[in-house]
């Protein structure tokens, strides 16, 4: 068998996240053990032709409706309410051509973070509609598929699409590891320049996208310029040495980034929307050092340590954003009550 980007890197991603070895399929699916996530929920693989959807559908509506009923008792008691929610989500996706991808993505993110209420309560009282169960991760469905064909303005087939409760939150592109002229940048270009313009509806619910050639993995949010895509790494002395020697294990970085708890953590606390110097709306997704640093600060606060920690930064590494991410997550931790966060800048 000759190696190409599909049967090498793409199938490697599927195998590591779900335990399905697509290169070993003959008459049926070969199931192996997926990478353990410390007893967390894992990704489940479904072949793209087995997803019950029309090729123009962004949302997997059957799965989404079941999830809405499972997570929200007031929808389970009246399933027609699920149709009303899905109708509103579809409306956001449709508006992308008018309001732009970043603004549509920001509006959809409010729903994903469970910040929207509807009059579904007693006497038409407004109650929060939960698309995702953040308190019990196992109560959500995590589905991964590959070669996902979608038709909006054009027909495109992203390599990897990852659904949470029937909503596509992650898009990934895999490139060949055996051609020196090809790198993760080619995959990022496909996503940022090609897919986001030809099938923008798929990216309205997007948390982040990733690109890899099997050596490095880079991530970016919607409309992130290629020069601002950032690597995702695991920072410890052993991994740092391995990376310098060219021996780092991409599988560890991949599974760390894409495990369900990390994905939902980034969705809740580690993405922000802002306006740049050109007064243009932008989305910012954390870099790996901001994610690790902010979580380390919060753990020290929870542990009651007097010294909350000192983090060394170089210029342009995103110090202000790290403080913002840490404050954003800290203020939503129930066990911390209502903490006062003091940020000093020079």
Q: Where are each of the predicted segments found?
A:
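ATP-dependent helicase/translocase motor core
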Residues: 2-345
């Amino acid at each position: 068998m000759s190696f190409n980007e599909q049967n090498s890197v793409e199938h490697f991603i599927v195998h590591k996240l779900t335990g399905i070895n697509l290169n070993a399929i003959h008459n049926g699916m070969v199931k192996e053990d997926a990478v353990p996530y410390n007893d967390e929920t894992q990704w489940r693989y479904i072949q793209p032709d087995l997803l019950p959807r029309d090729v123009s559908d962004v949302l997997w509506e059957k799965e989404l409706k079941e999830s809405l009923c499972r997570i929200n008792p007031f929808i389970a008691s009246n399933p027609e309410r699920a149709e009303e929610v899905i109708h509103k989500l579809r409306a956001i996706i449709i508006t992308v051509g008018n309001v732009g991808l970043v603004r549509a993505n920001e509006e959809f993110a409010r729903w994903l973070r469970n910040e929207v209420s509807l009059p579904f309560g007693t006497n038409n009282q407004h109650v929060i509609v939960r698309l995702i169960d953040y308190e019990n991760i196992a109560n959500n469905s995590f589905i991964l598929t590959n070669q996902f064909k979608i038709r909006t303005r054009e027909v495109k087939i992203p390599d990897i699409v990852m659904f949470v409760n029937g909503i596509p939150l992650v898009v990934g592109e895999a490139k060949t590891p055996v051609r020196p002229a090809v790198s993760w940048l080619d995959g990022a270009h496909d996503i940022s320049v090609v897919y986001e313009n030809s099938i923008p509806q798929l990216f309205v619910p997007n948390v982040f996208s990733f690109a890899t050639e099997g050596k490095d993995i880079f991530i970016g949010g919607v409309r992130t310029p290629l020069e601002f895509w950032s690597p995702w790494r695991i920072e410890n002395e052993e991994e740092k040495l391995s990376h310098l020697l060219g021996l780092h294990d991409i599988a560890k970085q991949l599974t760390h980034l894409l495990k369900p708890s990390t994905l939902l953590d980034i969705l809740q606390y580690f993405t922000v929307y802002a306006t740049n110097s050109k007064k243009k709306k932008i989305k910012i997704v954390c870099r790996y050092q901001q994610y690790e640093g902010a979580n380390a600060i919060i753990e020290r606060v929870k542990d009651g340590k007097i010294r909350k920690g000192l983090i060394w930064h170089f210029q342009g590494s995103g110090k202000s954003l790290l403080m913002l991410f840490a404050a954003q997550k800290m203020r939503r931790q129930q066990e911390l009550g209502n903490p006062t966060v003091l940020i000093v800048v020079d």
